[in-house]
Design a protein with these regions (language model features):
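N-terminal targeting leaders that route proteins to membranes or the secretory/organellar pathways
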Residues: 1-74
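Sec-exported extracytoplasmic/periplasmic mature domains
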Residues: 33, 37, 51-52, 122, ...
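A conserved glycine-rich beta-strand in the N-terminal activation segment of trypsin-fold
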Residues: 63-69, 79, 86-107, 113, ...
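Active-site region of chymotrypsin-like
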Residues: 76-94, 176-190, 215-299
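Intrinsically disordered, low-complexity Ser/Thr- and acidic-rich flexible linkers and loops
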Residues: 90-93, 123-138, 233-239
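Short, flexible surface segments
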Residues: 101, 107, 193, 199, ...
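Conserved positions in beta-strands of structured domains
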Residues: 103-105, 160-163, 222, 255
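Conserved active-site neighborhood of the chymotrypsin/trypsin-like protease fold
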Residues: 108-126, 134, 139-207, 211-215, ...
């Protein structure tokens, strides 16, 4: 009993940690702390599991969404700020008429909302271009462009719409690198399925509302269901979405400009795209990442 008491108190000092750094060793031991009370065999099995993860470079991805520093720095690499821009080649001027957020899902592709990727300048924007910028809207060479920026606030690139499902409000845009304008594409780790989610699960929202680059907030899942189920309380929802659209209502605060930004679970996997803010309740609504995956792999 004295040996067991010392083991539970001190852990196994004889594990082979190979070339792991001090921080990695501490993290391995921390992850296996609970298994110590079940004995040496259980503890050694846990150590082996997490040592392999550390050697494979995935250990620190295990719970990045809950670890403030590592989480934000890691997840930010896969999130982009999106600007919708009118480019007047005749006048050599640009006019930004909207912004949103997006998430990198492959080495070339970014998911966002269609109401971001397919936004059009409104009458106020066009009036400003005509009266204040002196654009000739009929004769000047003008093009609508999407620009993406990493959350480092430095690197910019063009992007083009390549796939859309407007009744799910999911669009996929493609990074269009040029010599001076390109970004490092670091995709999200994995998609988490809608069926794996439960009410009360931790979530983290990321985006750039109002041009506030890299805004993040946390909360938990409050409701899971389809647009058809939601229509009982929000009848107008079916005007914009298919009945089978999967929604996640959560407590991570989002704002105008958060649209298209990712919603992550506690493992740093994407579970949805933030899409709606309820007008009648303090609810933040994301469309399931299942719909991103369906569109990504569709023909």
């Amino acid at each position: 009993s004295e040996v067991r008491a010392n083991f539970i108190s001190d852990g196994n000092d004889y594990a082979n940690f190979g070339d792991l750094t001090k921080d990695q060793i501490e993290s391995v031991k921390w992850n296996c702390n609970r298994s110590r009370k079940y004995g040496l065999v259980a503890y050694n099995e846990c150590l082996e599991k997490f040592i392999n993860k550390a050697e494979g470079g995935t250990l620190f991805d295990e719970q990045i969404a809950k670890k403030p520093k590592n989480n934000i720095e890691k997840l930010e690499q896969s999130v982009v700020y999106i600007e919708m821009v009118l480019t007047n080649y005749t006048k050599k001027q640009e006019l930004t008429f909207g912004s949103g957020s997006g998430v990198i899902i492959s080495n070339k592709e970014i998911a966002t909302n269609c109401h971001v990727a397919m936004a059009e300048p409104d009458a106020k924007d066009l009036d400003f271009a005509k009266k204040d910028l002196k654009w000739n809207l009929k004769n000047d060479k003008i093009e609508e462009l999407l620009w993406i920026q990493l959350l480092n606030g430095k690197d910019w690139a063009e992007a083009k719409l390549i796939k859309k499902n407007e009744k799910k409000d999911i669009c996929i845009i493609k990074h269009n690198p040029k010599e001076l304008f390109k970004v490092a594409m670091k995709p999200i780790k994995e998609f988490s399925s809608f069926d794996s989610l439960k009410k009360g699960n931790f979530v983290r929202a990321m985006g750039s509302p109002g041009g506030l680059i890299g805004h993040t907030s946390t909360g938990d899942i409050q409701w899971l269901g389809t647009a058809e189920a939601m229509s009982r309380n929000f009848p107008n929802i079916l005007e914009g979405f298919d009945k089978d659209t999967k929604f996640i209502v959560h407590g991570a605060k989002i704002h105008s400009g958060s649209s298209g930004g990712p919603l992550f679970d506690d493992d740093g996997n994407i579970i949805g795209l933030n899409t709606l803010i309820s007008d009648t309740a303090a609810e933040n609504i994301a469309v399931s990442a299942d719909h991103i995956k369906d569109l990504l792999y569709s023909n």
